[in-house]
Amino acid sequence: MSFVIATFYHFVELSNYYDMKDEIKAACNNVELKGTILLAEEGVNATISGERNAIDKIFDFLRSDYRLRDLTWKESAAEYQPFSKMKVKLKREIVNLGVSNLDISLRGKYVDPEHWDDFTSQPDVLVIDTRNEYEVKLGKFKNAINPHTQCFREFPQWTESFSESKDLKVAMYCTGGIRCEKSTAYMKSLGFSDVYHLKGGILSYLEKTYNKNGNWKGECFVFDDRIAVDNSLTPSNTIKCIFCSNQVSTDKLKSVPRGQVVCSDCKLQCYSYNK
């Protein structure tokens, strides 16, 4: 059996998000979907998986809410169900930057995946990866700046040491688009005026460009049991240990906490993975 994996987010005011939880959970359970949907006053963020008909039905349901009528999503496929249960969670933020009163309407301009390579090759464009360190170690765009953050909440702290001119163009990217979109709003709140982000993130880039120019190097970490996908969005069987670069079976990583992409030897030697 083949499963459709759909990822989506949408920044929109959901003042009644508390009341939406049970109804959305029931709709997902009725069509046997699994995955996680996050709801907050600022919008929705999710990755869900199920059969083709179930995915179609849930998006018909979600888009029947006028606030979500413009909801779009990205799809990939797997031969197994990458989630064990269906969860709908209430959050303060749909992606946790930890900055209060951020005006998301300040967000930067989209760069379509087909234009990303040409745009980021310009000498006056700085490319910033907004993902976590363990994600960047698996793969990144050439010449992208790595902030070396362990979680998204550390990004504002990193910007305090970011000394580049605010007149430069800044292009930001992440896995599916949500972190880079929110971080562009934050960068603009700091006074950077020419800020851009990759529409749909790395997953959309790989889907639409096939990485034909080789600008993407490595694999892309994903937040489900696939662990990582390659250039063709196919789940990887093995990936590099982020410490020693030896290959690790992704099957061995499905039951460990998020981000622990390490081989057995490094796990024993590294205190942070042996608590």
Swiss-Prot record:
Q: Which residues form the active site?
A: C174
PROSITE patterns xref list: RHODANESE_3
Signal peptide start and end residues:
none
SUPFAM superfamilies assigned to the protein according to its UniProt record, in alphabetical order: Rhodanese/Cell cycle control phosphatase (SSF52821)
Q: What does this protein do?
A: Catalyzes oxygen-dependent 5-hydroxyuridine (ho5U) modification at position 34 in tRNAs.
Cited Gene3D superfamilies? 3.30.70.100, Rhodanese-like domain
HAMAP family named in the record: TrhO
Q: Please give the catalytic activity noted in the UniProt record.
A: uridine(34) in tRNA + AH2 + O2 = 5-hydroxyuridine(34) in tRNA + A + H2O
Annotated protein name in UniProt? tRNA uridine(34) hydroxylase
Ordered alphabetically, the record's keywords are: Oxidoreductase, tRNA processing
Supply the enzyme class, top level. Answer: oxidoreductase
A GO MF term: oxidoreductase activity, acting on paired donors, with incorporation or reduction of molecular oxygen
Enzyme Commission numbers on file = 1.14.-.-
Q: Cite a single GO BP annotation.
A: tRNA modification
Rhodanese domain spans which residues?
121-214
